[in-house]
Amino acid sequence: MSSPFQDVAPRITGNPKVREPQQGAYEALAQHVADGADIREVSVVLPVGCGKSGTITLTPFAYKSKRALIIAPGVAIATQLAADFDFSSEKLFYARCDVMDGPNYPEPVEIRGTDANRSDLDAAHVAITNIQQISGDGNKWLRTLPADFFDLIIFDEGHHSVAATYEALKAKFPAASVVNFSATPLRADGQMMSGPVVYSYPIFKAIRAGYVKQLKAIQLNPKTLRYVRRPGDSEVEVSLDEVRRLGEEDADFRRSIVTSEETLNTIVDASLRELDRLRNLTGEPRLKVIASALNYEHCIQIVEAYRARGRKADFVHSRESKKNDQVMQRLANHQLDVIVQVRKLGEGFDHPFLS
């Protein structure tokens, strides 16, 4: 099967619409391939905001891939990546950044569920899915594919790629080259991302170029804190010295602090003051708050606190899978001031107006 990744010369180097880190990563990967080094797996480190999704669309060109498989860490990221390859979408990276001309765009297929149409896979030049879709033994489409079906595997948030599920996927397609993309090469458990880093774009350059927002912490300094004591759900006030001691020793205490009404109200009010300040400073009313919750009940508690202050707020959670699409559409349409999540909009999720 002929592939545009092999037949088309993309306009990348020197293209003003392609960002410096995107060009640099592509050139480093292409050079790695040209060098012919016997290294199957490599890594690219790009800070959030530098255009990692766009760089992923360029990577199959660097490898002159016949058919690539792209693995995202979750559904939200997979959907974003699929849009960058979708030639019916205004988000198509190749058209948006003048990388190549139609109609010879690579044919994408997005894999959802445990079954996939084999004819769609056979016709595709790139398949996009999330790691949960290929976990376990229930994925019929994966088991039926020959070992040489993909010649390139790309992991978004690739610092997870040392995990067992990722290793099993690499073993399924043993001849495929592997590229890991991440903003950090280090996992939470201390393991490093697999493969040598062939390109890394410094965070200070990303900030200077305006790809990454200047980050500023807002410190709240109460004299005392209240926490929820269980059982009974009564709130207890403690001194800061006691907070420090209990916080170092007791994980349940740390969770109780953030579920306290008084603590929640303090954080909500501070976040809204900062949101209003940024909106007034920039003249951009579409800026939003993203808040992380501990669990489903905490999601509801936070949303209700923002709504009580007259703000449009909602949440996404794995328990509300059908509702999540509606909430994400409201977020995209700027119909929310606040989005609350529990490990649902994690690493790699990008929305330009989350402040």
What is the predicted role of each segment?
Residues Q191-R286:
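Interdomain helical connector at the RecA1-RecA2 junction of SF1/SF2 helicase-like NTPases
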Residues I131-I134, R143-N180, T184-P185:
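SF2 helicase catalytic motif II
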Residues W141, I300, K312-R343:
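Conserved helicase ATPase core of P-loop NTP-dependent helicases/translocases
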Residues V338-Q341, L345-S355:
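A short beta-strand element within the Helicase C-terminal
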